[in-house]
Amino acid sequence: MSHDTAAGDATAPGDETLTVYTDYVCPFCYLGEASLEQYRAERDDPLDVEWHPFDLRSNERGPDGEIDPAADSGKDEAYFEKAKENVRRLQEEYGVEMSLDIAREVDSKNAQQAALFVREEYPEAFAAFHERVFDALWQDERDVGDPDVLAEIAADVGSADSEGAEIDTDKLRAAIDDPEREAALKGRFREAQQAGVTGVPTFAYAGHAARGAVPPEHLRRLIEG
């Protein structure tokens, strides 16, 4: 859970693409999405954006890959209270309504695996699915680690997209349980670490990066110089 504005070492895959490293369970990532949308709305030219998953709770996972309730996250109550204070400040600054009462036990791994599936198989629906997963957690307080919730989101996105094919929710459920897709997701997590990403959100563009829910003007400087 990061909210500082320090530059990092992460690099984007292409000079004209903004890579956003993010995790659905991070409130600052949700706020960062809002800042990015404000910046994109102010731009004259379109901006290519690539989502890259990041495992914010990697140090809490057991050998089976699941969250271990007994694991020490290294964060105490004072940390979480300070984080909430920062979230509230940014909510007001960016005009974002969101709940801070979600369970800390929510695991985003299934959501990120489902999102990779949607991006690969239904690319025209990815942006809407990605947004709805964030909204489901931070607006509706739903457990986005639940395959039923993810299937419902996929069905809603597909039915609302008149230009693309509806997302096959049976295939989405199968993708969540697919060991090969899980291995691919873990590979993306490793790529983020190898790129020097240590916190989220991280925005990377042309060899430069900004970390945290930075305001639109910071994104403008990152991208436009």
What name fits each language-model region?
Residues 33-137, 141:
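Structural alpha/beta surface segment adjacent to cysteine/selenocysteine redox centers
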Residues 28:
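Short, cysteine/histidine-rich loop/knuckle motifs that typically chelate Zn2+
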Residues 13-19:
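Extreme N-terminal starter segment of soluble prokaryotic enzymes
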Residues 1-11:
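Secretory targeting signatures
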Residues 12-13, 74-78, 163-166:
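A broad, low-specificity signal for short, low-complexity segments enriched in glycine/proline
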Residues 3, 21, 25, 33-47, ...:
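C-terminal cap of thioredoxin/glutaredoxin-like
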